[in-house]
Each structure stands twice: as C-alpha cells, then as structure tokens.
Amino acid sequence: MSARYAEIGVTTNFSFLEGGSHPQDYVHEASRLGLDAIGIADRNTLAGVVRAFSEFDNEELIHKPKLLIGTRLCFADGTPDLLAYPTDRAAYGRLCRLLSAGKLRAGKGECHLTFADLEAFIHERSPSIHELATVIHPPSASINQPSASIHQFPTPSWPGLTRPSTPTSKVVLVSVDARVKPGHDGGKRVADNSQILLVVMPSYRFQTKTIAIALERLTALNADAVWLGLTPYYRGDDKRRLARLRRIAAVARVPCIATNDVLYHHPRRRALQDVLTCVREKTSIDKAGRRLEGNAERHLKPAAEMARLFRHDPEAIAETLRFADRISFTLDELKYHYPDEPVPPGKTAQAHLQDLTEQGIKQYFPNGISDRLRATIAKELAIIERRGYAHYFLTVHDIVRYARSQDILCQGRGSAANSAVCYVLGITCVDPTEIDLLFERFVSEERDEPPDIDVDFEHSRREEVMQYIYRRYGRHRAAIVATVIHYRPRSAIRDVGKALGLSEDVTAALADTVWGSWGKGLNEMQVRQAGLDPHNPMIGRAVELATELIGFPRHLSQHVGGYVLTQDRLDSYVPIGNAAMADRTFIEWDKDDIDAVKMMKVDVLALGMLTCIRKGFHLIAQHKGVRFQLSDIKSEDDNAVYKMLQRGESIGVFQVESRAQMNMLPRLKPRCFYDLVIEVAIVRPGPIQGDMVHPYLRRRNGQEPVVYPSPSGEAGDKNELRQILGKTLGVPLFQEQAMRIAIEAAHFTPDEANQLRRAMATFRNVGTIGKFEAKMIGNLVKRGYDATFAKNCFEQIKGFGSYGFPESHAASFAKLVYVSAWMKCEHPDAFCCALLNSQPMGFYAPAQIVGDARSNGVEVRPVDVSFSEGQCTLEERCGRHHAVRLGFRMIDGFRWADPDEERVQLEAGEPPSDDWAARIVAARARGAFTSLEQFARITALPKRALILLADADAFRSLGLDRRAALWAVRRLPDDVPLPLFEAASAREQEDERAAPLPAMPMAEHVVADYQTVRLSLKGHPMEFLRALFAAERVVTCREVSRSEQRASGCWLRCAGVVLVRQRPGSANGVIFMTIEDETGIANIVVWPAVMEKYRKEVMGARLVLVEGKVQASAEGVVHLVAERLIDRSAEMGRLAEGLVRPALPDGADLYEPLTSEKYNYEALNGDRRDTPDAPAQRHRHPRDVRILPPSRDFH
C-alpha cells in the first residue's frame, strides 16, 4: 500500500518576508506529489487562503488534495507558536475574530496576541469588532464617546520582553446590537464538534518546561483538539530532539503529529527564502548567521519521504490524516449577507427602490420619458428583484445622496453606466439608452455574480464620504478591501542587492535602469548600462533572484476605495486590521479574493478632475454669477468645444491630455459625444494591440469601405456582427464588442465567456488568458472568418486584459472629458485656477498649465503678500477673462491649509494646522501692508516663512525684489516675540548704511522662481540658453513642426526641458517624450533600440538634446524620431552661476543669492564663533541644486 500524508504546516509568501512560494505553487506541488491534504497556515493572517482556494478551479490540477484553512498564531507573551485550524464555519468565525482582536490593538501590519485572547475566543463569545465601533485611539487623542468604557489591553509581563514600540492604545467599547445572526455562533458556548484544532510548534531550541506548560494549559482549554508538532530540522540532532518532544507529549497525553514546517514548495526556492529572511531581519547573507536555514529541506515532501523520515514514529504520519479528516470547513461555506437598508414602514426594499426610481424619472425627465427608456427601466427592475439586489442599489444611492447633500461632486462609472436605473437614481451621468449600452454587462441572470458599482468622488473630499460610511454602518460591518503590494523590479533589485551585500551605488545603478513599476526583470543590456558586468557571478545571481522575487507580496495596504459591507459582523468572515491612516480599517482580502468568495463591494473612488470641476464651478459662480452642476453641461454637436479638441488643444482636459490622445484628436476630429466615447477608448492597449485603430480611422475618413466580418457559406448569418460592430464601422473597439464576438461568432458558452471575462480582468497579474486563444481563433476560422481578423480579435482581448475600457466606462469618462473641455474653452481663467488648486493631478506640471492659460489670453499674476491667498484665486477682468492670482500654496514648503482637508480634520476633532497663509490674509484684512518690517510684526510669521516668501519674490508690492527682500529678512531678529507695547516701535537692529545691491540677472530670477514656485512668469529657462544652443545648430520646438521641414522629413537637432515620459504597454517598448522650450513643445519618439543605447539619458535627463528625423502624419501631427540623445541638464547650472547658498533655519532647502556683501551667518544660524569644533556649513554647487521639477512619467 502506498504511503499517505497530509502536510499541515505550510507557510506561503503571505507570511510576508518569510514564505518563499505563492499559495498557488503549493497547490500545484501538492497535487503533483499526490498529498492527501495541504494546510495553509500563515503567520497571524488568512490573507493567502483564498488564492489557494481559487487555484483548485484550475483545470490543470489532476489530483486535488484537500485544502485546510488555517493560520499560525504567533504570540507576544511567550506562548509557543500554534497552528490553528477551524473545523467548521462557527469555529472559523471565532478564529477570524481572534485575529481581528490582535490586529486592532496593533499598528498596521502587526498583530499582538496573548494567551488570554486565545482563552477568550476559542469557545466563548468575547468583545470583538462587533463592539469596537471606534478603533485604536492614541492616548493623546480625544474620544468622542462620553458614555463608553475604556479598556486597556494587557501589556507583556514575561521576563526579558520589552514593551511594544507602538504607544499604548485604547479601544472604545460601545453598546452595539450583538444579537445572534442566523448561521453564526453568536454568544453561546459552541457545540463540542465546533473546534479550533491547535498544534503546538516548538522552535528548534525549545524549552521543555515552556512546551509542557503550554500543552497543559491548552488541553485544559481545548480538550481533545491539541497536538504537538514534530518537525525534523536536519541538523544532526533530530533523533534526540524529537524523542524529547515525544516524552513531553506522552506526559501531557496529547498526540504527536508530523509536519515539515514548510517554507517553500521546492528546494530551488531556498536561496530566495534566505533573501527574504535577510530583508526581514535587516541584514545580509554574510551577516545573518543562524537566522538562515541550514539546508534546503523545508519544502513540500512526498508521502513516502515523510514516512521514511518518521519510520520510527508512523503514528505521527497517520495522525496527519486523522487531523485532516476532522476538518470539514471550506470557504464555500461563507454565505455572504448584504446589509438590509432602512426602508419606509410597510415597504420592501424592492418597492422602495421602485419609488426612488420613479422620483428620479420625474426629476431627470420632467416632460416624460420615452417608451424605450420606460421599458428598459422596467426590465432592469425585474432583474434586480429576481436577483435580490435591491439593498445594494439602495446603499449606493444613499452614499451618493449624502455626497450631493454635502456639495461633493460624484459620478458612477464602469459597468454601472449600462444601467438606466443607476442613471435615474443619480448614480451615473450617462443615459444608457442614448448610446445603446447593455444592462446585462452590469447584471446578468446567467452570471451568479453580484453587481459592482464604482463611484468617483472629488479626491480632496472623498474622506468625508468614507467616514460617513463608517458612521452609517459601523466599523463592525464596514471595512476597506485590501490591496496586495507586490515586489516590482526596482524594489526587488534593491532588496536583493542589500541582502547579497552589494553596495548602495551598485543596487541604485541597477534599479535606475528600470522603467516604471512593471516588468519581468533586468536584461544584459540594462546591466551593462548600469556600468556593471553581467557575467560577474554576484551580479548575475542578484539579477536572477530579483527576477524570482518580482510579483511576491511585500505587504498589505488598503484599496483605493473598495468597501465591503455586511449584514452581520464582518470579522466573522475575514480578519480586520488597522490601516496606516487614522480612522481606517481594512480586511485582509483584496478585490479578487472577495470576488472568489462572492462578497459584494462598493467602490468609493477618488478622481482629481471632479475636484477641479467643482472648484471651477465655484469660481464661475463667485466671479461670474452663474451656477452650474454636472448635469447642466450638455454636449452640443460640432460646437466650439469640439473645434478646440480637433486642434489637439487639450492640456488639462480629462483623459485626453496625454501625448497619444493629443495626437489622436486631430485624426479622429470628434464632432459629437459618442466620438468622445471612442476617443477615450481607442488609445488603449486593446484596440492598439488588435490593430483596430488604423482601420477605424481610415473608414471614418472615407479612405476604405465599411465592411462587416462574416462567416462563410452555411456557417451562419452574414450579418451576425453588424449589430455588434455597427456603431464602430465594423471594427471592434470596446471590451463588450470583443466579448460578444466570442459568444456570437466564436460560439463560446455563457460560462466560457464569463471565464474569459475574468481572465481579462486578471491578465496583467495572473496571465491565464492564453488558454482561450486556440479555442477562439480556431472557432472563428472554422466558421469562415478571416484568420487575420480572428487573431486581431484575440490580441485585442489580451490588450483589454492589460488595460482597456468597456464602452460604459468610456461613456462615463467621456462626460467628464466634455465638461472639462467646455470649462477650458468657455472659462479658461476658472479652469486654470481650479487645476492649480487641485494639484497634484494630470499629466502636466503647474508651469505648463499656466503657460497654456497665458497662450489662451489669461493673465496670470505672481504670488504676492498683498494680494494672494492660500489657494490660487481670480481677480478683476483683464480683457475677456479674469486674471489668475497665484496662491501661497504654490510656494514649496510654505504652510497653507486646504479647506477640504480642514473640514475633515475638524469633523474628526483634530486641532487645526498652523496656517501661515491664513495669518497673512487675516492680517491684511485689518489694513494694507506698508513695509516688510510691518508685515513681519503683524503676521508674526516665523523667520523661515519670511525667507520662503522673500525667495518666492512675494514682496514686490512692498517695493522689494527678491534680492532686496532676502537682504531685508536677514536684518530681522530671530523668532523672539517682543512685548506688546514695545513691538510697534521697536527697531529690529541698528540701522546699517544703505548699500545698493546689484540687480539680480533675469536668468537667476527664473532659476529661483522654478526652485520656489515650480514655474516662472518672467521667462523660460531655455530662453537664456538659446544662444548657446543656436551656436550648435539646435532649433526650437516650434521650428520642428514648420511646414517646409515636415515636408522634407529632414534631420534636426532640438533641445528642451523634459515634461513627460510615457511607455505605454501597448507600444511594444516605444518611449514617447514631450519636451518644452520657450516656443512650445515637441513630441519625441524613442524606439526600443535607441532606448537601450541611451537608457540613462532617456530616463534621467531633465534637459535633453535630441537628434533625429522629423516624421509627420497626414493630419499634421509631427514627431521627432530620436536617433541620439544627449543629457544637457548640467547647462541649467549656467543659469545659476554664483548661486551658492548656506543652510537656512528649520532645515529650509533654500539658498540666498550671493552678493558683494559678506554673509552674516550669525544672523541666520546663531553665533558659531565660539564653537570651533562645530561642523562647517554644508554648501552645494549650483549644478546640484534642484532647478527644474522632475518630469511626470507614465507607463
């Protein structure tokens, strides 16, 4: 009879920086080895169990071992580690609550458990997150629960253990309804067969007394559900060590159970596990010593091998099978219940939803609706009722209603835009019947999946909405979904380099050759470009291990806004922990995990453009007297807005401001709203990889006939794709079209199509879409479709898997494209001001936003203490438009309070921040400033704030330019308050003889502007280098696009400041750069071969000289195709010749300009003459001073 064995001690890489293999790796290896069962037991977490659970759906698994769901409990009070496995659903709920209790008293990513916690949760109900309506409060925080009782969690008391580094925390317990919910253990003692099975895991150097006491306490607590784990460590003393453990178990009368205490699925992962240990222990391989495993034996082993190792104790092997047989729980048993929304008395949720829908119809269609829309709404409501989703729609409606009541802009997007019900409820802004969107894409009776509604809110005010959800549902029923932060190329290279002992400059050089966040590793060319030898054994090993590490989970973080809401307590489904941000809690599972266990989430997302639009609307109302809402801006075909977009004038416009979109606009020439839908979707990996863009443009421009692919002969209806592809001229551009082609033309079953859709959604991370390729292409070709069309369709599907837009999503975004373009066209002053006040967002830095506004006739005025406020503002009209006044927020390092953030802080009871800008505005309201001394006296700003203002040239209205203001600030006393009645007349110091200061050259002014406010209204840095570059026959960006040069396709040299670098995944390695000089911008194309040759210049240059050939499209879009790139960033230092500055108070990273006068270091830094041993002032050469802000890089 062949040996049988169940491995119960598997540590995956969700025991972060410990396990050396993915959960999926273990499932496949256990299947290959023919194990009876495999138990996932990560350190104080259940984060990886769903990955293993989901992998059992993989058709490649021939043998499917039983999956045991558990965790490894690690304690803070000296209790030995325990493997914990729940036998049923009730026991699983208690285990989740135990983990939640430990996590909620600790900081993010930590779990502080004691044996007392185990005693409380193993059988009996205990205070859990159901009662924890408010989570951790530091001792200094105010707790707005006057009637709550405060409980201090116990602190460690065993010898030699230090107090945790986090401050003592208080958890507020408030009265919450804790009635037993159906299917849960509630508060009664559980039945004997509902147990958490516990396995004591002795360390290598265990203490006999410690293990004996633990077994005694556990058996008293858990009767027949305790085991002692036996693990061979292969260090020569296993026989003696395991014999000691058997004697301890015999005395305690508990069975022994075998486990290899697995750290990786295969021996080849041992080296990577050593690296992870070094990262965790913050050491290197040569210093780690015994913290590393002594061999490569901690891997999954076949039953025969484990039987051989335990040949003197076969019962320990047999016990693994008995242990596995006692566990019946699977994740299939998690029966999710969506929260019941309050409804009016006598109404059901469905009836209430129908009432709200009717109210929405009257609001949005006061003159009545079409029969078609009425029929669509009735159909949707019927499906919602049959699927039981009314409560979900009511939840989202309630959240949107709250946001609108607080004047927070929001808009639903994604598949929800397919729903007419969502439209009349005010959740989405696009009428799906106008562009023929498909409700079944959102909710289908054929798919047993919950709907998923994504709602965007203003990014500056989303926190208000999130806190409303916590208040509305309680923290016992609401938490944010997790996001798994994975190792990416740069972080993998850095951590592996440190672990292997490579110097910081070597790891930095390797990391700096990586573009963006995604990639598979380093190639030989990149290693050479880092100045290293790829054949060096240590370098080669580092690259190999870093490549293995890419994709490993590094830690958990909170999702950008996905909430899980439950009817009963959430911590009975999944453990909950604290986020790094105050007042945030999140679960351990990510969006794919909760999809796998069929839990519903509500996405509360942040969108910067909504903030910009709301602020723009406010400025228009304030200064022009006209009030707008999103729904008021109607798209009118072929108006001035579309004409602006046709010219490619889209800087700042949502979704169409990238280089690729700006080039597409003149080619597509949008004339109506649906053209914008296509514009948003067409510059995406799906249509590009599927080679669908050029055919669509040619057909749109009448350059080729519109034809619809069709099957041959008797294979099917010749027009079966006409209805699917009619709106896009026979060319599939949207995700829905590709899916419908799979069903209608490739004859995929609904289940296969659903699997394909899921594969598309996870392609970028998982890459499982390839298994559908042969079927889809084969079926299409078999039915007579052209093979090229079939291949292109599937390439398009793979592109959508990388990053593609469904039609409904594109339609939602197209609405914001039009609104932002309308504001840019009709109100460029308000648009510029709102964009600046909404930073950071978008493709372009403030310098380009301001430059674009000025080119459109908007006057922009500098920061000035007599006129500016914290935010940028509009001033009196200057010509057609109001002038934009830059605000104090533009000054790097200057303290100003965002009113949106202040509102959240006040609601949370936090003290207001020190707002220097508000001090200036308040002082100015009492009278005009007359001098710098008076300004300093009545604002009482610290010396550092005055230096920042002077360096930003903000005292011009007081008759002081930058140099004079800096000199005057130097003469002021340090931050020592003067007596009340002496302050008005006190002189800061003895008058100095007035010394005329040399005028600051304009080039230095521009440099200082960029250093302080990130832009200059005085000029462009390239203006002052023009003579230098002209002597080298370098042309301007404007000259690159001159008509005679476009026609000739000539060779040119052009130089400029790098604004944006892009490497789209659909461009096959091509880099697109946008550079700027004083005349405008130029688009640069860098082919992969050139990129590899000039990687350092492409990735690192702030100012670059490009040599290449002009390439122009028929629509007049011009590119310079690079053949050679030269980093000329050092030329910026020429503008700052003589600009060497000492350090300033409070660590300000600013430097005073040199003058003919001697610096008074004592005035700035205190008298240092009596401290000869004090370190010398650190100076920085001008070429090391940051002059230009970094480019904005996208991939």
Curated annotation (Swiss-Prot):
Catalytic activity: DNA(n) + a 2'-deoxyribonucleoside 5'-triphosphate = DNA(n+1) + diphosphate
One matching Pfam family: DNA_pol3_alpha
GO MF, any single term: DNA-directed DNA polymerase activity
Gene3D superfamilies reported in the protein's UniProt record: Metal-dependent hydrolases
Biological process (GO), any one: DNA replication
Listed InterPro entries: DNA_pol3_alpha_NTPase_dom (IPR011708), DNA_pol3_finger (IPR040982), DnaE2 (IPR023073), DnaE2/DnaE/PolC (IPR004805), DNAPol_HHH (IPR029460), NA-bd_OB_tRNA (IPR004365), PHP_dom (IPR004013), Pol/His_phosphatase_N (IPR003141)
Keyword DNA damage part of the UniProt annotation: yes
GO cellular component, one term: cytoplasm
EC number of the protein: 2.7.7.7
Main location as per UniProt: cytoplasm
Domain of life of the native organism: Bacteria
Location in the cell: Cytoplasm
UniProt-annotated stretches for the region Disordered: 1163-1195
Keywords in alphabetical order: Cytoplasm, DNA damage, DNA repair, DNA replication, DNA-directed DNA polymerase, Nucleotidyltransferase, Transferase
Function noted in UniProt: DNA polymerase involved in damage-induced mutagenesis and translesion synthesis (TLS). It is not the major replicative DNA polymerase.
Similarity field: Belongs to the DNA polymerase type-C family. DnaE2 subfamily.
Name of this chain's protein: Error-prone DNA polymerase
Species, as recorded: Rhodopseudomonas palustris (strain ATCC BAA-98 / CGA009)
Phylogenetic classification of the source organism: Bacteria, Pseudomonadati, Pseudomonadota, Alphaproteobacteria, Hyphomicrobiales
Gene: dnaE2
